[in-house]
UniProtKB/Swiss-Prot annotation:
The lineage of its organism: Bacteria, Bacillati, Bacillota, Bacilli, Lactobacillales. It comes from Streptococcus pneumoniae serotype 19F (strain G54). PROSITE patterns: PFKB_KINASES_1, PFKB_KINASES_2. Belongs to the carbohydrate kinase PfkB family. LacC subfamily. The keyword Nucleotide-binding applies. NCBIfam families: 1-PFK, lacC, PRK13508.1. The keyword Nucleotide-binding applies. This is Tagatose-6-phosphate kinase. Its EC number is 2.7.1.144.
């Protein structure tokens, strides 16, 4: 089983409009509300793929109850309740544009943060792989993910970590390393304080920087140009076919689902990389975020090429 961790989930509300009118009333007919957050996108895709998944994280108030109720019944859930209220994230879809209004979310009390560590430690006993995704809520220290990684390492469970900014920097500077990280070029540039291109020789050098020492897998998305990856001392380039992109949002989460599944099933490097890329591409072909149509899985899988570089 795979444990997904979403520390700052949200109720994602979608308001489709023909036109967004400013300083007046906009009436919405077709409203959708879903359990949101990067980790919950990972959860949905793993469930649709057919892997056993347990979802955890922090929820609070009536919105927290709503969120848990709106996670697929096939998914096991064991969230930790806090005093603060789970946030709303609103997307206004008008024409070809999308305007987002994102609430900051609750401030987590220090005691709640400590108690979640104990909660997380108990959940580790029943899972084989951990996937941690998204931002940290206010109130938790910037190195909180390093504490989760430390507990998972002590339990012998591999960790796929998908976060960015100061939270990722804190983990990289910690002695407790995740098994997998998946930064993109922009995030690599931010971490290193210099521009990083998609040139393969440059990426090889970058991923051997001391900052990334001790991390078994580093998987870098190159968008339509596929993926560059480092596993131990071996480098890979994944070439992907052109596809019709409907909605790319959440494709990185689907990639995390594929990586986690590959670790769970102890797949070869090539199998793990292909699965991760295919699930990301399947997500991009769907209107709904964090959703894949498995009927198209094998046809895409057969088109991907992994080469050692």
């Amino acid at each position: 089983m795979i444990l997904t961790v979403t520390m700052n989930p949200s109720i994602d509300i979608s308001y489709p409009l023909d036109e967004l009118k400013i300083d007046t009333v906009n009436r919405v007919v077709d409203v959708t509300k879903t359990a949101g957050g990067k980790g919950l996108n990972v959860t949905r895709v793993l469930s649709e793929f057919g892997d056993s998944v347990l979802a955890t994280g922090l929820v609070g108030g009536k919105l927290g109850e709503f969120l848990v109720e709106h996670i697929d019944n096939q998914v096991k859930k064991d969230f930790f309740s806090i005093k603060g209220e789970t946030r709303n994230c609103i997307a206004i879809l008008h024409g070809d544009n999308q305007t987002e209004v994102l609430e900051k979310g609750p401030e987590v009390l220090e005691q709640e943060g400590q108690e979640f560590l104990e909660h997380f430690k108990k959940l580790l006993e029943s899972v084989e792989v951990v996937a941690i995704s998204g931002s940290l809520p206010a109130g938790l220290p910037v190195d909180y993910y390093a504490s989760l990684v430390e507990l998972a390492n002590q339990a012998g469970k591999p960790v796929v970590l998908d976060c960015s900014g100061a939270a990722l920097q804190a983990v990289l500077e910690s002695p407790h390393k995740p098994t997998v990280i998946k930064p993109n070029n922009e995030e690599l540039s931010q971490l290193l304080g210099r521009e990083v291109s998609e040139d393969l020789d440059e990426l090889k050098e970058v991923l051997q920087e001391p900052l990334f020492a001790g991390i078994e897998w580093i998987i870098v998305s190159l968008g339509a140009n596929g993926t560059f990856a480092k596993h131990g001392d071996t480098f890979y380039k994944v070439d992907i076919p052109r596809i019709q992109v409907v909605n790319p949002v959440g494709s990185g989460d689907x990639t995390v689902a594929g990586i986690s599944s590959g670790l769970l099933h102890k797949e070869s490097d090539a199998e793990l990389l292909i699965k991760a890329n295919v699930l990301g591409m399947l997500n991009a072909q769907e209107k709904m975020t964090g959703h894949v149509n498995m009927a198209n899985y094998q046809a895409l899988y057969d088109q991907l090429i992994v080469k050692e570089v």
